[in-house]
């Protein structure tokens, strides 16, 4: 029987560092539409939705032909929005796709799904990229991951980890804004209170780890450019121009 795998892109208008970010035009196309189009290329997704509390975003998504689900504005996180959107749905795997990665590789989405398909004991998955640029490694806007021998994440941090005692650049990984969930665990996680490390690093995935849930990572050599501030739009446009 074919699995129902739903990719959901949580999206809100009022980003603190970049208000209106989902509707920012990137080479003539709203960013949220670019994210949807990339997600729709993933072979392992059955459906792609956008979960938002903003009618402007919903209208833009629906105009592009994709599905938008309205969620309450009181929800504080993307995880909460996804859990709400899927609360009455029967799905096998859920993928949380960040709305600020307009060149997200479809292969990365498929990799997150594949981790959960291979091992039914794993409740949550993600994707990391080998990190070789020291400036990115030092950048607090770039989230780093340290992995165990089986690919399970030991920690996520904005700090440059692991720390090489003898100096130089260590074997490091950059975390992509992408998660796969078992639907039951997603609903549980959304109901948990924020945890100390989550609040310290401002990284929601640490809530799962602090509650004893293993997050398994797939390592993929793919491109990933997150749009955090307006200047990042130019980086994405330069990448798209170079790729043509």
PLM features per residue range, with description:
Residues 170-244:
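Conserved alpha/beta core of the MobA/IspD/sugar-nucleotide pyrophosphorylase nucleotidyltransferase superfamily
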Residues 49, 55-114:
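Short phosphate-binding loop-to-helix
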Residues 104-195:
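Conserved core of the sugar-phosphate nucleotidyltransferase
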Residues 45, 91, 119-122, 213:
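Short, high-confidence coil segments that cap the C-terminus of an alpha-helix
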Residues 52-53, 104, 181, 228:
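A conserved hydrophobic position in a structured secondary element of the catalytic/binding core
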Residues 3-51:
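N-terminal glycine-rich phosphate-binding loop and ensuing alpha1 helix
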Residues 7, 48-50, 94, 125, ...:
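Hydrophobic/aromatic residues located in beta-strands of well-ordered beta-sheets
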């Amino acid at each position: 029987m074919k699995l129902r795998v739903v990719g959901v892109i949580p999206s809100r208008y009022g980003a603190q560092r970049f208000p209106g970010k989902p509707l920012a035009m990137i080479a003539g196309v709203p960013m949220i539409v670019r994210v949807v189009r990339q997600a729709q290329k993933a072979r392992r997704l059955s459906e792609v939705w956008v979960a938002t509390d903003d009618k402007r975003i919903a209208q833009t998504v629906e105009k592009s032909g994709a599905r938008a689900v309205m969620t309450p504005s009181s929800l504080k996180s993307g995880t909460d929005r996804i859990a709400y959107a899927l609360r009455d749905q029967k799905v096998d795997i859920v993928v949380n796709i960040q709305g600020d990665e307009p060149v997200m590789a479809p292969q990365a989405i498929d990799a997150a799904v594949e981790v959960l398909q291979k091992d039914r004991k794993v409740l949550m998955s993600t994707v990391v990229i080998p990190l070789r640029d020291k400036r990115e490694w030092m950048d607090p806007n770039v989230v780093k991951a340290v992995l165990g021998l089986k690919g399970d994440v030991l920690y996520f941090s904005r700090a440059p980890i692991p720390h090489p005692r003898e100096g130089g650049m260590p074997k490091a990984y950059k975390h992509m804004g992408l998660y796969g969930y078992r639907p039951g665990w997603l609903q549980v996680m959304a109901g948990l209170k924020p945890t100390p490390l989550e609040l310290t690093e401002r990284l929601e995935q640490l809530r799962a780890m602090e509650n004893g849930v293993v997050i398994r990572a797939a390592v993929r050599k793919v491109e990933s450019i997150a749009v955090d501030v307006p200047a990042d739009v130019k980086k994405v446009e330069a990448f798209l121009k170079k790729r043509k």
